[in-house]
């Protein structure tokens, strides 16, 4: 559709402004007591999307090093006591573990989307592992 030039028109009156109700007028004229401002809140999902973009850009490890190291030592004790680990070995285990978990969560998210949901559930993770052949 072609754009046309707008010309100024003189207003021909119109409706008179309505009178405010007494309650509205009283509410507007009442002074704000305390002056406490509500803290700013982002809409649901905004922060989540920002975090997704941030973590997809980054390459750093997401699990803290010491808790992961304690977990590895605790699991290793079931197989052999007094095992010692090089720091590089713990680092390699952590890299592999995080790569596995990220991939599993990606597949889990695809399963949830396939079910027309945006929230992942345990059944999505079970399905992802079953399709991968990790669990019968």
Curated annotation (Swiss-Prot):
Modified residues (N6,N6,N6-trimethyllysine): 5, 10, 28, 37
UniProt cross-references to Pfam families, sorted A to Z: Histone
Region feature Disordered, mapped onto this chain: 1-43
Xref: InterPro entries: Histone-fold, Histone_H2A/H2B/H3, Histone_H3/CENP-A
UniProtKB keywords: Acetylation, Chromosome, DNA-binding, Methylation, Nucleosome core, Nucleus, Phosphoprotein
Gene3D superfamilies, per database record: Histone, subunit A
Descriptive protein name: Histone H3.3 type 2
CDD domains for this protein: HFD_H3
Residues annotated with N6-methyllysine modification: 5, 28, 37, 80
